[in-house]
């Protein structure tokens, strides 16, 4: 398994009166090319979990394997691990600091010992991937729109050419148009480059649409794990822990209560439409 997490627990301020358990007995694995969504309410442990995956935080207990390497082993170079695991923090545009878009994207690869030409190649490739025009290369990143800044920040990670891309709430604070553009671009990058992609979000609609697997976090533990259909089949369980389900799933549940035979794992409007039309045709023939 490219990513394997075994019995991981994490305690903030361990050994002090302020100790707080953030993760408890976490177990899961992620295969090559999987797109995984991690969802949960604020304080559920989502961000703490992803910071374990590239060594920013070290588990209080348990092991984490990236491509077969135990990254909790003190002998392992975390610098090498971070070349493989790219992490885009929430509001990544706040981490932009260089004079130009080009320099900001180039910062990471410039520290990999690459030649100037190789760095340039990676920067322009990353800009193309995220949809940032070359004309913006010499522009200050602080003059860009919120969505463009977000793309520049993601490009800075992609220029490192990671095998695993982790994004923490990548659409937070964006308007609906910017949000949709970023999500579409992330899915496009995943489909094209076949890297493992992990997307942290609290938005069920987003996750249902693009993830292959969903991990539901609750109070530092994994509440549910499975495909979108398997997870959203447990709508009542999700609502009990304060999470909403996709609107179409809620609609399907209400229609079932009224006798319309729609499966509990409907995820798209198209699916719901097919079941409703089938039902209506059937009632007309009675």
Swiss-Prot record:
Residues 3-244 form the ABC transporter domain. SMART domains: AAA (SM00382). Pfam families: ABC_tran. InterPro entries: AAA+_ATPase, ABC_transporter-like_ATP-bd, ABC_transporter-like_CS, ABC_transpr_CbiO/EcfA_su, ECF_ABC_transporter_ATP-bd, EcfA2, EcfA_1, P-loop_NTPase. It is an enzyme of class 7 (translocase). It is found in: Cell membrane. Keywords: ATP-binding, Cell membrane, Membrane, Nucleotide-binding, Translocase, Transport. It comes from the Bacteria. Belongs to the ABC transporter superfamily. Energy-coupling factor EcfA family. Forms a stable energy-coupling factor (ECF) transporter complex composed of 2 membrane-embedded substrate-binding proteins (S component), 2 ATP-binding proteins (A component) and 2 transmembrane proteins (T component). NCBIfam families: ECF_ATPase_1 (TIGR04520), ECF_ATPase_2 (TIGR04521), PRK13637.1 (NF010158). This is Energy-coupling factor transporter ATP-binding protein EcfA2. It comes from Caldanaerobacter subterraneus subsp. tengcongensis (strain DSM 15242 / JCM 11007 / NBRC 100824 / MB4) (Thermoanaerobacter tengcongensis).
């Amino acid at each position: 398994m490219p990513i394997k997490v075994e019995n991981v627990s994490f305690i903030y301020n361990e050994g002090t009166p302020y100790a707080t358990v953030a993760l408890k007995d976490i177990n899961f694995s992620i295969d090559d090319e999987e797109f995984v969504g991690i969802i949960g309410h604020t304080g559920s442990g989502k961000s703490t979990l992803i910071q374990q995956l590239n060594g920013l935080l070290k588990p209080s207990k348990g092991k984490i394997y990236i491509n077969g390497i135990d990254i909790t082993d003190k002998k392992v170079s975390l610098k090498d691990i971070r070349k493989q695991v790219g992490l885009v923090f929430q509001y990544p545009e706040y981490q932009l600091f260089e004079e130009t878009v080009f320099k900001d994207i180039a910062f990471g690869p410039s520290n990999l010992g690459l030649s100037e030409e190789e760095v340039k190649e990676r920067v322009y490739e990353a800009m193309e991937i995220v949809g940032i025009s070359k004309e913006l290369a010499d522009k200050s990143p602080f003059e860009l729109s919120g969505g463009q800044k977000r793309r520049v920040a993601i490009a800075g990670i992609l220029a490192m050419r990671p095998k695993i891309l982790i994004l923490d709430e990548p659409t937070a604070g964006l308007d609906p148009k910017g949000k949709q553009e970023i999500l579409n671009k992330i899915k496009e990058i995943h489909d094209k480059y076949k890297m493992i992609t992990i997307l942290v979000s609290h938005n069920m609609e987003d996750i249902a649409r693009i993830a292959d697997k969903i991990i539901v976090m609750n109070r530092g533990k994994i509440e549910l794990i499975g495909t979108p259909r398997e997870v959203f089949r447990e709508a009542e369980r999700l609502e009990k822990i304060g999470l909403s389900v996709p609107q179409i799933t809620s609609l399907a549940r209400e229609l079932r209560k009224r006798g319309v035979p729609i499966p509990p794992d409907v995820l798209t409007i198209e699916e719901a439409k097919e079941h409703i039309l089938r039902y209506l045709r059937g009632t007309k023939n009675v």
